[in-house]
A protein has these predicted regions:
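Long, low-complexity, Lys/Arg-enriched
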Residues: 1-109, 118-181
Length: 181
């Protein structure tokens, strides 16, 4: 059985949006990685501090699936210019190198659907030049079109959204696909 490790930037639709998994949580549901590395910008750190929404949902998913996720938070509290493409490639490359060394027996999954376009672009590029031990995974929206943001992300009730997440069923739709670099 293949072991997986997930590296994911975190974006505004994580962990749950419109009563469906955000990309990061959906990849966890489908691939069941042993370790999950979450990369948070200043704004995402503020949400994390408020209600621990990312770890909360991953741990609840683990309870639902009977799977233990080892979650690591990478906080970048000074990162505000998340739109700048030049910021991410070098740092992501180094982080992923460390992850690969620590988990040499695992396949690394890169979430190329969460975060800003610059974050996703850097991860897609790293996957394209890295070979077979890294898989870029994209996750389609439930509607297969642009996400409508119905909830107020600042007044987010993580317990409510977990309870009413429509993907918490055995017959959920797998929206993951491997990106062909």
């Amino acid at each position: 059985m293949t072991k997986y490790v997930l590296f994911s930037a975190i974006g505004g639709t994580d962990p749950i949006s419109n009563f469906r998994d955000g990309s990061m949580l959906h990849i966890c549901r489908v691939y069941k990685p042993e370790s999950v590395y979450l990369y948070l910008s200043k704004e995402m750190c503020e949400f994390h501090d408020k209600d621990d929404r990312y770890r909360f949902c991953i741990h609840r998913l683990g309870e639902l699936l009977g799977h233990k996720f080892d979650v690591h938070i990478i906080e970048r509290r000074d990162l505000v210019d998340v739109h700048k493409f030049d910021l991410f490639y070098k740092e992501y490359r180094e982080l992923i190198k460390e992850i690969r060394e620590k988990h040499s027996d695992a396949t690394v999954i890169l979430n190329v659907s969460s975060g800003t376009p610059s974050m996703k672009g850097a991860l897609q590029f790293i996957a394209a030049v890295s070979g077979d031990s890294i898989i870029p995974v994209q996750v389609s929206t439930p509607a297969k079109k642009i996400n409508e943001h119905r909830e107020n992300i600042k007044d987010y009730d993580v317990h409510f959204y977990w309870e009413y997440n429509k993907d918490n069923t055995k017959d959920f739709e797998n929206r993951c696909s491997k990106s062909e670099s």
